[in-house]
Swiss-Prot record:
It is found in: Nucleus. Its main location: nucleus. GO terms for molecular function: SH3 domain binding. The lineage of its organism: Eukaryota, Metazoa, Chordata, Craniata, Vertebrata. This is SH3 domain-binding glutamic acid-rich-like protein 2. It comes from Bos taurus (Bovine). Belongs to the SH3BGR family. It comes from the Eukaryota.
Length: 107
């Protein structure tokens, strides 16, 4: 399983950049393996992201904005969902991963 974070390296919006950095920093700090997918560099990846976000999770108008998070091809959520899971200490569940505490206990 690979966590994939769809982001935009050349976003002109400071808020989007901060959200992307927050997700990446959290994953790095918790040693969660992930892949960054830059949708500004690949139209194919951008279209894949748009197509694989469930209709009920898409905005009423416009396209979904990065960051968008997937576990392989399974949609996890956007930044707001990530932030909520971070606040409630359920990020591993949000990402479809076993918690690191559970894996350490099994070792």
């Amino acid at each position: 399983m690979v966590i994939r974070v769809f982001l935009a390296s050349s976003s002109g919006f400071v808020a989007i950049k901060k959200k992307q950095q927050d997700v990446v920093r959290f994953l790095e700090a918790n040693k969660i393996e992930f892949e960054e997918v830059d949708i500004t560099m690949s139209e194919e990846q951008r279209q894949w992201m748009y197509k694989n976000i469930p209709p009920e999770k898409k905005p009423a108008q416009g396209n979904p904005l990065p960051p968008q998070i997937f576990n392989d091809d399974q949609y996890c959520g956007d930044y707001d969902s990530f932030f909520e899971s971070k606040e409630s200490n359920t990020v591993f569940s949000f990402l479809g991963l076993k918690s690191q505490l559970a894996s350490k206990a099994e070792s």
